[in-house]
Amino acid sequence: MKTAKIYQYQLPMDSGVILRDQRLQQRDGLIIELSDGKHTAKGEIAPLPEFSQENLEQAREDLISLTQAWLNDEVLDVDANCPSVAFGFSMALLELENNLPEVGNYQVAPLCSGDPDDLVVKLNEMSGKKVAKIKVGMYEAIRDGMVANMFLELIPDLSLRLDANRGWTPKKAEQFANYVSPQYRSRIEFLEEPCHRPEESLEFSKATGIAIAWDETVRDEGFEVKAQDGVAAIVIKPTLVGSVGKCIELVEQAHLLGMQAVISSSIESSLALTQLARLAAWKTPNTIPGLDTIDLFKMQLDTPWPHCELPMQALSDLEVIWES
């Protein structure tokens, strides 16, 4: 007999977590728990403020409706729901059917969100390929260029991933590039969405030789993966994109064109983050995923992230807001 529960969580965040225009003091989300009588599986639904098209209340309504359809054995169109619900519910179904491999890729590209000196220490301790991520576009473009150049100069075997979140005008993007030595530019794996408009980002790549990646563009209406000069990767954030099936389609399309596909976090709890690590190991085994976000939290949820010492919130401690 099928049963389902929906939990709601609030997890405290590190004080330094800033989204586009606001400080994120706590992460709010829902956990769906599905049981088929033999097995139980979970998925996380956590719209990200300022990035998701839906809010938590809209997600809750979609989730209850979809869960009722599942309990009634109706034919499900998971992607007809808002993206965070499509992702979390499809992940729970994948787990329930035992189709998500247990092995995870927990190697991360460390995120430089504070003192650059801290990142240098962290990178020097890394074995294997050294890849780091830096958020750019929040300060002056010239400063961002100088910081990127400094890392590439200090650590000769370092590759950088940069994320501008469409933050620059073409002029600002040019200022950034002017402060990155041409000899180091090939070690920028990609710069996510440097300019406000995709065509401006393509022009930037053509002019500078710096590879770019699509992130926000992946979620634009009618997006298709296609080979374009200068585009090295697509960044897939399942909470913002939709179902696991939809994400896998994007990965396969990118790989067919010789592009990287990077599974990336939308600041989910450790529960979903570990599932994303398993998805990454399964579908993008040769690419380091973008999952270095657990340290933005003050607490884990239900499932531990390897080597993380943050305290754990048990699912049994959460409020059940719906069950059947």
UniProtKB/Swiss-Prot annotation:
Single annotated GO MF: magnesium ion binding
The protein's required cofactors: a divalent metal cation
InterPro entries: Enolase-like_C_sf, Enolase-like_N, Enolase_C-like, Mandelate_racemase_C, OSB_synthase_MenC1, OSBS_N
Active site: residue positions: K135 (proton donor), K237 (proton acceptor)
This protein's pathway: Quinol/quinone metabolism; 1,4-dihydroxy-2-naphthoate biosynthesis; 1,4-dihydroxy-2-naphthoate from chorismate: step 4/7; Quinol/quinone metabolism; menaquinone biosynthesis
PANTHER family registered for this protein in UniProt: O-SUCCINYLBENZOATE SYNTHASE, O-SUCCINYLBENZOATE SYNTHASE-RELATED
Name listed for the protein in its UniProt record: o-succinylbenzoate synthase
Organism of this sequence: Aliivibrio salmonicida (strain LFI1238)
